[in-house]
Amino acid sequence: AAGKSVGLRINPQRSTQDGHEIYDPCAPGSRLGTTRAQWNAAVAANPALPNLLDGLHFHTLCEQDSDALATTLDAVAQKFGDLLPRMQWLNFGGGHHITRPGYDIAMLERCITRAQQDWGVTVYLEPGEACALNAGYLLTRVLDVVQNGDTTIAILDTSAACHMPDVIEMPYRPPLLGAGEPGEKACTVRLAGPTCLAGDIIGDYSFDAVPAVGDLLVFGDMAIYTTCKNNTFNGMPLPAIYARRPDGTTREITTFGYSNFKHRVGK
């Protein structure tokens, strides 16, 4: 359409993922991005196709440093370097952990400069979780504590499946204020949700003493991939959202009730 800039997502077929396969667009058989073989076949069928494009886009990173970007850019140059001089822009996608301590900013700058100098393109980076890395808390209370053999299990009023699905999907173990790794402190406890999903498990943590019913637990790094992915499976309520001021006081942003659940599934 007139006034629109058209781009194509490409698949450089160079995987840099380690432990995040669910977020790896370069995995074999991926549905995300056009491979060079697919591009060649499409152009053979429609030679005018390259003239329709203003830019190329790849999004292959997930919580990674710029060395993974450099590796990806090498693959892009190898697979698609001949196409880029005719493009106006190149989008590096997201997944850059720019705000993480130790992130190699200089390497990122070299990658951007390389693309600008080699192909004359404008370079874009998409905002990602680095914008809110290590921000946000999820507060939960202990509903029950049970013992199954040697395993102590605390049932919480939050759910991995409903409120932090990446814990199961990636998987990963979210940080918990004041807790240690399994076996680090006196009591190791498995924290789990109350849903019917047997695998609704947040992880194993150690404490100085087993948490009691009613105790408040605070998970960190919860601002990303939580509110946008949460759900009401088993009728689990959605967490209320509060803003914490610098002086420690809080302000209610929004709360959720039955009407929110009802409107999501019908009138």
Residue locations for each model-derived region?
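Active-site-proximal beta-alpha core segment in soluble small-molecule metabolic enzymes
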Residues: 1-89, 101, 111-114
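A short helix->loop->beta-strand "cap" motif at the edges of active sites that frequently abuts
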Residues: 4, 120-121
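A structural signal for short, well-ordered beta-strand segments and their strand-loop junctions
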Residues: 7, 91, 123-125
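Short, small-residue-rich loop/turn micro-motifs
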Residues: 10-12, 94, 160
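Gly/Ser/Thr-rich helix-start
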Residues: 34, 56, 94-96, 129, ...
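Conserved active-site and cofactor/substrate-binding residues in soluble primary-metabolism enzymes
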Residues: 34-37, 67, 71, 75, ...
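Glycine-rich beta-strand-to-loop/alpha-helix junction loops that act as flexible
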Residues: 60-61, 90-99, 127-130
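Charged (often Lys/Glu-rich) extended helix/loop segments that serve as interaction or gating elements
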Residues: 111, 122-267
